[in-house]
């Protein structure tokens, strides 16, 4: 097995991938709660990133660590859960449905990943809108094929399919890809301190 020291991680990754992430090296064992342990500099950092909010309960939550062996056994096989079912999947869905699913919504839909999550929300919104227009006797896509999704400037929603038309943080992330010309709204951010220049900018927003 290859062994790499924390101070070698970035140089090693750079030989094979675009390694432009943060300058720290996460210690998967010593990170805990809302604290990342950086093994590159042997320090703890307050985690206000939470991996784009995909880790809402923090690092190494005790209840998850208790199930480490079970979770590891399940994770060995990356099953296509839409096609192949297991007892473990049924138990997970039953638990999530009992604790998190609102009574007025009969079904759940699961997506792994932020961009695909955004993309499926867009598809659900488009589907709902077209069904709503049909119920009202209004023209559908055949007569009005252009669907617009309003979104903020400075937004990053991913780089897959529809999300390319929403992402606009850095042109290099979306250049050379076909995109929809959807309306972009000024991001109503506030820059501190609020001086005369900032007040004037806010008035324009």
Task: Please provide the spans of the model-predicted regions.
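N-terminal glycine-rich, Lys/His-bearing helix-loop that initiates the first secondary-structure elements
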Residues: 1-104, 178, 195-197, 201-203
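PLP-dependent aspartate aminotransferase-fold enzymes
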Residues: 94-205
């Amino acid at each position: 097995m290859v062994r790499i020291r924390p101070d070698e991680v970035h140089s090693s990754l750079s030989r094979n991938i675009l390694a432009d992430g943060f300058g720290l090296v996460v210690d998967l064992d010593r990170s805990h709660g809302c604290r990342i342990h950086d093994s590159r500099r042997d320090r703890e950092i307050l985690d206000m990133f939470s991996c784009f909010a995909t880790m809402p309960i923090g690092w190494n939550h005790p209840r998850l660590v208790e199930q480490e062996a079970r979770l590891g056994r399940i994770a060995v096989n990356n099953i296509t859960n839409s096609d192949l079912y297991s007892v473990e999947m049924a138990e997970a869905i039953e638990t999530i449905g009992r604790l998190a699913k609102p009574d007025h919504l009969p079904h759940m839909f699961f997506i792994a990943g932020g961009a695909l999550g955004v993309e499926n929300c867009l598809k659900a919104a488009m589907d709902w809108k077209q069904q709503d227009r049909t119920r009202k006797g209004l023209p559908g896509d055949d007569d009005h094929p252009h669907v617009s999704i309003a979104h903020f400037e400075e937004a990053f929603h991913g780089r897959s399919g529809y999300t390319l038309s929403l992402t606009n943080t850095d042109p290099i992330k979306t250049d050379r890809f076909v995109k929809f010309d959807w309306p972009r709204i000024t991001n109503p951010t506030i820059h501190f301190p609020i001086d005369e220049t900032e007040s004037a900018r806010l008035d324009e927003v």
